[in-house]
């Protein structure tokens, strides 16, 4: 039996649990930043799940304007913990700068993926239940509307068809192609 027989399942569990919690913290940050409905059941779930560590962090890390900096600090700390744990179990050690940059890159990737999923899901929901209300569509609308509104300024409706979701998806994919490779390369150089 190889060593990976035991470490691979452990890596999977650590990565899965921390990734889910990181996603919850990121969604809470984004929904708070976008001004999403606080009493929405999804918002309430995210607040309750992420409140304990944020309550402690807020004593030391105050918000800056509309930006909840304690959520950002928690995101980076959790991602660094996840990356450090996984790399350590794989026998790879990085210096703190490379680890921080790797974690930042993964958070930017997650942010872009959250928006890609949100725009896509919001567009699908608008086709099947236009004007309908449910907790998920309200959250998705709050999250995507600022980005879609920006796209609508440049791309008007054509024959009643809104192409802003398509434009937003193209912009998000372009951002992935332009922003992420230099960050990954820099992390490789530092590490």
What are the residue ranges of the model-derived segments?
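Selective transmembrane helix interface/packing segments
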Residues: 2-191
């Amino acid at each position: 039996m190889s060593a990976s027989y035991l470490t691979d399942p452990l890596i999977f569990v650590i990565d899965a649990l921390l990734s889910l919690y990181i996603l919850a913290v990121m969604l809470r940050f984004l929904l708070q930043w976008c001004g999403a409905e606080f009493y929405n059941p999804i918002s309430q779930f995210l607040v309750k799940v992420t409140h304990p560590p944020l309550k402690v962090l807020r004593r030391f890390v105050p918000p800056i304007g509309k930006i909840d900096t304690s959520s950002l600090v928690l995101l980076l700390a959790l991602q660094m913990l996840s990356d450090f744990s996984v790399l350590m179990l794989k026998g790879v050690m990085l210096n703190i700068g490379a680890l921080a940059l790797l974690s930042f890159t993964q958070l930017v990737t997650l942010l872009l993926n959250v928006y890609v999923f949100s725009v896509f899901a919001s567009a699908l929901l608008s086709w099947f239940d236009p004007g309908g209300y449910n907790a998920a569509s309200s959250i998705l609308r709050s999250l995507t509307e600022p980005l879609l509104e920006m796209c609508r300024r440049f791309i008007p409706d054509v024959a009643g068809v809104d192409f802003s979701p398509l434009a937003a998806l193209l912009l998000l994919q372009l951002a992935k192609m332009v922003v992420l490779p230099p960050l990954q390369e820099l992390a490789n150089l530092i590490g």
